[in-house]
């Protein structure tokens, strides 16, 4: 796939929404200047949807901070990991014509979906990091749906900046993604049962 469509992407045609779609898996990101539907499945991981309305460039990443304490100071390995995940996406968007000072964010995920989680909850750490990062970079958060006990399937329409969130019951597909990028899920929808709540923001 060419650079304009980003790296590590999985493209298909979504018959329901009648649009070219791209699945973004754990540890990946996708930037585009085309009308696309970016799709990901989240448990404790976080997805950041970025848009530059002027240039029409948009993108999404999907990441999980390494295990550790709640200390996310700039010098910690967890903070460096998170910053790198954000900078990879932003750099690709800039190559397509986006301006950093025009970026707007919508953030999702960080659900506490794993059984037997430690005192330091993974979702809380990811939430603290991404809010702090975006504040420091002066990137406004237009919408968010974070924490809670559910998994989420995220549909990001890059042409409009709109995001459809499907709240999911705990499922095998979501739980698998809580293992830090061990293996790939062939079908992100497999085993996921849609809950009662859909959000369109």
From Swiss-Prot:
* Matches recorded under Pfam families: CheD
Catalyses which reaction(s): L-glutaminyl-[protein] + H2O = L-glutamyl-[protein] + NH4(+)
User: What biological process terms from GO does the record include?
Assistant: chemotaxis
Report which superkingdom the organism of origin falls in.
Bacteria
User: In the record, what terms sit under GO molecular function?
Assistant: protein-glutamine glutaminase activity
Question: Per the similarity annotation, which family is this?
Answer: Belongs to the CheD family.
Q: Quote the protein name from its UniProt record.
A: Probable chemoreceptor glutamine deamidase CheD 2
Species the sequence originates in: Chromobacterium violaceum (strain ATCC 12472 / DSM 30191 / JCM 1249 / CCUG 213 / NBRC 12614 / NCIMB 9131 / NCTC 9757 / MK)
- The record's gene field reads cheD2
